[in-house]
Amino acid sequence: MVELGIKGYQEEIVTPELLACHIGSGTVRVFATPLMITLMERTCRLSVQPYLDEGFETVGTHVNVSHVSATPEGMKVWCDSELIGIDGRRLTFKVVAQDSHGIIGEGTHERFIVNVARFQAKTDTKLE
């Protein structure tokens, strides 16, 4: 059962594939904002997945974060998340990303609990 206060943690090393200049979000050799957001989403998703029934997953629906400090290639970055709101199937998380010099990004992220088979079937109707 999903409850308020569930915490998550994920970390990674900023490799060349995670740089803004590599993914096209900029020309500088720094941790790309879209991939910081990916780290935040993954941290939230993995934190609650063990509490969901089989066949259920969460999908990201809203991101409200600031990327406040650049991180160069080779540094470790990590994200902490905390589930701070539950409204039916909507989950709201506080997210904070850091490197060894401090906070690099923070904000909130919302996810919805979905039945995977039903969600995929509904989405696939767009192909018809």
Each predicted region: which residue ranges?
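Catalytic strand-loop segment that frames the active site of acyl-thioester-processing enzymes
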Residues: 1-32
